[in-house]
Amino acid sequence: MPTATKSRPAPPASRTKNNNGPKSNAPPQAQVAFGKITAGVGHRIVTFGPGGVGKTSLSATAPGPVAFFDLDDSLSVLGNQLDGLDIRLVTGIDSWSDLRAALHSPGWDAVKTIVIDSATQAEELAIAYTLKTVPHEKGNKIERIEDYGYGKGYVHVYEVFLTLLADLDQHVRAGRHVILVCHDCVSNVPNPSGDDWIRYEPRLQSPASGKSSIRLRVREWADHLLFLGYDITVKDGKASGCGSRTIYPNELPHCMAKSRTLDEPLELEYRSAELWEKLFGTNSK
């Protein structure tokens, strides 16, 4: 009788990866990148204070050559106070487009500091540009910021002004210092833990809602927000001063301020380079 043949089990499927199969189209997973801390970039500085305190004169003594956007027509009044300073007046600035075009033009290689005097006036140019170029969503005629509707005009101006800060950031990354000179205003400070109070702040757009506040955005943008004020004393409701002036680099009840490097107030003296030496080093010139 014939012997039955035993069937053998089939060999297990190979566990070797088949490289001939379809490949995944998924992009490679991104990895975090690390770099060195950038040295040699410029400082973003904002100064503000009452009229005549010396904002323009101080800016003119910054490390030169100083390129000056004299939107307030201040330099011609200062006259011989500017003797010996390396100031290069940027001309032909009559509109917001002129201001931005100049910042994007070639020829900045030798400049160490850019001054816009004032950012308050630059904001006026931004408003005029907004009214001219941003239409009403329903096609209505626009003559004032309020004509856009509740709060919308402030949003438009805010977005326009941000383009200037971006332009200036390019110069900061190239190693140039930027100084925005602002006029001042008195603003109410809400205090959740007690009574509100008033203080000096830069005169820039800042709606009560806090939204679209150019003032608060500029404070965030700046490395140094410096208040320049006269030294006064008040007794029995009467104020008196001695003519001395102080640069405040830190927030106090009477002024908005900040600095990434300065800790103490400085006396503001005529054509003194002390501020720039403390900010940029003794060889800042």
Q: Model features per residue range: what roles?
A:
Residues 3-36:
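N-terminal pre-Walker A segment at the start of P-loop NTPase domains
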Residues 29, 35-128:
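Conserved P-loop
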Residues 30, 52, 99, 161-164, ...:
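Amphipathic coiled-coil/heptad-repeat helices and related helical stalk/stem segments
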Residues 57-59, 170, 217-218:
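Hydrophobic/aromatic ligand-binding patch that stacks against planar heteroaromatic rings
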Residues 66-67, 178, 225-227:
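Short, well-ordered beta-strand core segments
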Residues 109, 174, 220:
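Structured loop/turn residues at beta-strand edges in well-structured enzyme cores
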Residues 119-214:
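P-loop NTPase motor core
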Residues 187-285:
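Conserved GTP-binding G-domain of TRAFAC-class P-loop NTPases and closely related GTPase folds
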